[in-house]
Structures are given as structure tokens and as C-alpha cells.
Amino acid sequence: MAREQLQVLNALDVAKTQWYHFTAIIIAGMGFFTDAYDLFCISLVTKLLGRIYYHVEGAQKPGTLPPNVAAAVNGVAFCGTLAGQLFFGWLGDKLGRKKVYGMTLMVMVLCSIASGLSFGHEPKAVMATLCFFRFWLGFGIGGDYPLSATIMSEYANKKTRGAFVSAVFAMQGFGIMAGGIFAIIISSAFEAKFPSPAYADDALGSTIPQADLVWRIILMAGAIPAAMTYYSRSKMPETARYTALVAKDAKQAASDMSKVLQVEIEPEQQKLEEISKEKSKAFGLFSKEFMSRHGLHLLGTTSTWFLLDIAFYSQNLFQKDIFSAIGWIPPAQSMNAIQEVFKIARAQTLIALCSTVPGYWFTVAFIDVIGRFAIQMMGFFFMTVFMFALAIPYNHWTHKENRIGFVIMYSLTFFFANFGPNATTFVVPAEIFPARFRSTCHGISAASGKLGAMVGAFGFLYLAQNPDKDKTDAGYPPGIGVRNSLIVLGVVNFLGILFTFLVPESKGKSLEEMSGENEDNENSNNDSRTVPIV
């Protein structure tokens, strides 16, 4: 049986959309803007790093990062992100969302700058220091996932909560675009100031000494939006749900939200104390009671995020083939180092503009209309369909006259990842767990996703290699080929459909309804259905 809600929480649930909602979206969203910039800008400069630090005299093609170095440079931030999601998620429940929120930004600011200052006399030393700082950059980025999602969900009203939380996540799309646009500007400026011949004409002269500044400037620029947001985050009040339900301070919660909502709210400290005495609310994380109430939900959020990120991040494998096929990136030897940065940045920006960003904002528009479950199910379904449609007739798509069709199918997979599970896996864990575990459980779910990202980004990089050892990329062992890898990804997406049935629908419900925190007794089960009943 449900009890009467605390007035301060009810006021938040029924509040009309106000300016403070948009302020919270901007403050939290700028963190995700920075996260995406920092995580994805490395892909813009890895080719340049290969030219600068791994040039081979007399080689027909420009230098490239060795496979182990490329894996480390691209993947170390994911490792840091995973660790940060677990640590800051736990800390957000222990110390409060606000106290920890500023820490993540400071780590991101310092490590963005430090990444651009990576030093050493030998290429290995430069790459080692770059990897060190990018690990800790990822650590700060990881903290932003559970904290931003939790803060936004706890501030939002129940009618438009999904749109607000997914809008924060959608800022990633703008971060990816900003990285590409900034790289275009920087590379254009350096090309105009320091023109140089193509690699085929002058191998050594094609990489100017000033190119070493280009990648450093691009990496360090990530500190700017993070630094600009720090003051605003420090002025945000603690969320009422943490203050009331975890810190047990109804007076402070009412005072904070009275200022935010600009309404008079009664503290109700006595009612809160009565709620706190109930033994049913004393169960711990991973206790028998927790597992009976939320175990399947946690399995649902972790498994779907894990499976989604395997598919989502492995799609980057095919970008180089697609960009080359449609002429966005000419052969490396036909360009100088700075021109290559420009071409890669332009391609990434176009992909973000045409498929990534629209997908995010379709989710924002429809998540509170058709629900999280429907969007996630639809996204996984279409990702499965398009992956098999690419895989089964793969030889058909390799013919030059059919490559545009391949690009369209590929873009649609990206679109339905973002208008689908890439957004919903972020939203749902912030809505369905009790306040005292909310940040931790979101961190666990997100960390599971980053584990999937590592499998997708690196496992499939090896898996997709040609079975013929003479046709593999330099330094890689034979794999199962692109076609078979696409079939595996189709199966992964299909598993995502099945595990989605473990994830409850939270559209239109309060956080306390979803978590069972408004139930009167120990035997009351959370009645949120996994599959929505129409």
C-alpha cells in the first residue's frame, strides 16, 4: 500500500516546466558536451600521432600507430571512465550529489590540459604520458554519468522527466560535432599558415614541425567548457530527494526547493522521521531484499547497456571504409598531415550532423510519449535488422555502385542506436532504484556499458580482420572477417531485445513509485511492470 508522499517531493513531481529545469539541463548537459568532446576528439588525431611519432623512412604510406599503441591511446580513457563511474557513483550516494559533482569537472579540466602537455624524448614516452593523463581524464568523465543522470532525474517532474534526462545525454551529440568543427578550424588555420606538400611528393616535409601543436591544442580545448560550467555546478543546491530521503533533513530539502520552485513548502520533519523508522527501508545494496526487489532490474540495465555498447562502439570499425568509399577521405599518401586531420574531422562532423544528433533529439521528443521500453525495443530491433541486412548480402555492398546504399544503412544503424537504447540505457537506471542506491546503481549500469565498449572497440577490431593473414591490417592476426563480425553484432543486438524485457517502464511515474520507497510495509513489492500493460 502506498503512503502519502512528502510535500517537497510531490511539489517536484507536479511542478510545471520552469526555467530551473532548463538551467539544470544546461549545467548537467555541458558536462556531457565535454565528455563527448574529450572521448571522441582522440579519433581525430590518432592518424596525426602516427605520422609524427612513427614515421618510417622510405615507406610508401605515412606512419601509423602500432596496434598495441593505438589500442592503448584509444581505449585507456574507457578504462578510466569505467573506474570513475563505479567510484563517483558510489561516492554520490555516500556524500551527496552536489559535493561530488564539482570534483568530476576539476579532474576533467586538469587532465584535458595535461593530455595536451604529454612529454618525452621518445615516442613511447609521449604515448605513455598521454595514456596516463587520458586514463584520469576518463576517470572524471565516468563520474559525470551517474551524477548528471541522478541529479536531473531528481530535479525533474514526472511528466517530462524522460525528456529532461535524455536532453542532458543528447548534449553528447553536440560535443562530438564541436570536436569535429574545432579540429576543422585549427587544421585550416595551420594549413593556411604552414602549407606543406603531400606525403607522396615529400614524405618528411608533409608533416611540418608545427603539427605537434595541432593535436595538443585539440585535446586541451576540452578543458574550456568544463571550466566554464564549474561555477554553476557549485551553486546548485543538493537535490531534495538526497537531502530528505538519504540525509534525512526535511527542513533543508524544503528550504532549497522553496527557492528553486518559488513556492512555500512545509518541512514535514516528523513525517520523515516516521518513514525513517521503518525497517523495510534498511536493506543494503545487494542484500537479499534488494535482490528480490531490484535484482532483475539491475540485470536488465547492466546487460542492455553492455550489449548496446558492444554494437555501438564496434560500428566505428567501419567508418574508415565508409569514409574512403564515398570519397570523404582520400588515400593517406595523397595528403599532408594537416590535411588528413581536416578530412577526418569533416567526415566525423557530417556523420554527427546527419545521424547521431537527430537520433538523440528524436528520443528527447518521444520518450515521454511512447515510453522508454518501446523506444529501447524499437532501437534494438532496427539495429538487428540493419546489421543483418548489411551482413548477409555483404559482397553486394562491396561493389562500387552499391556503396551509397551501404552508407545509408550504416547511418540508419547509428540513428536507431541514438533514437533507441543508447539514450534509454542512460535514462532508466536513474529512475528505478531507491534514492540511497540510485547513483551507485547507475554507475554500475554505466560501467557495464563501458565494458561492452571495450569489447566492441577492441575485440571486434581484431575479430573483423581478414581470415587471410596476407590481407590483415599491419600488426594484426587473422580474424573472421567483416561479414561474420556483422553477423555476430546482429546477434548481440537481438540479445538486447530479449534483455529489454527485464527493464521496467517508468513513464509518468514518480521515482518513489518506481523504487518502492513509498510503500508502507516490508512485504510490499514494487509493482512496476517490466513489460508495459496497455
From Swiss-Prot:
Topology of the protein relative to the lipid bilayer: Multi-pass membrane protein
Any one GO molecular-function label of the UniProt entry: symporter activity
Region Disordered: start-end pairs: 512-534
Short name of one Pfam family: Sugar_tr
Tissue specificity: Mostly expressed in roots, in tissues connecting the lateral roots to the primary root. Also present in flowers, in senescing anther filaments and in the abscission zone at the base of siliques. Expressed in hydathodes and axillary buds, and in some senescing leaves. After Pi starvation, localized in all cells of undifferentiated root segments, including root tips and root hairs, and in the epidermis, cortex and stellar regions of mature root segments.
Gene Ontology biological process: phosphate ion transport
Residue intervals annotated with topology Cytoplasmic: 1-24, 92-99, 153-161, 233-293, 371-372, 425-442, 506-534
Expression triggers: In roots by phosphate starvation. Repressed by the Pi analog phosphite (Phi).
Chain segments annotated as transmembrane: 25-45, 71-91, 100-120, 132-152, 162-182, 212-232, 294-314, 350-370, 373-393, 404-424, 443-463, 485-505
GO terms for cellular component: Golgi apparatus; plasma membrane; plasmodesma; vacuole
Description of post-translational modifications: Ubiquitinated by NLA. Ubiquitination of PHT1-4 leads to its degradation by the proteasome.
Cell location: Cell membrane
Source domain of life: Eukaryota
Keywords (A to Z) from UniProt: Cell membrane, Membrane, Phosphate transport, Phosphoprotein, Symport, Transmembrane, Transmembrane helix, Transport, Ubl conjugation
SUBUNIT field: Interacts with NLA.
Remaining remarks: Although related to the sugar transporter family, it does not transport sugars.
Family: Belongs to the major facilitator superfamily. Phosphate:H(+) symporter (TC 2.A.1.9) family.
Record function comment: High-affinity transporter for external inorganic phosphate. Acts as a H(+):phosphate symporter in both low- and high-Pi conditions. Confers sensitivity to arsenate.
Protein name: Inorganic phosphate transporter 1-4
Species this chain originates from: Arabidopsis thaliana (Mouse-ear cress)
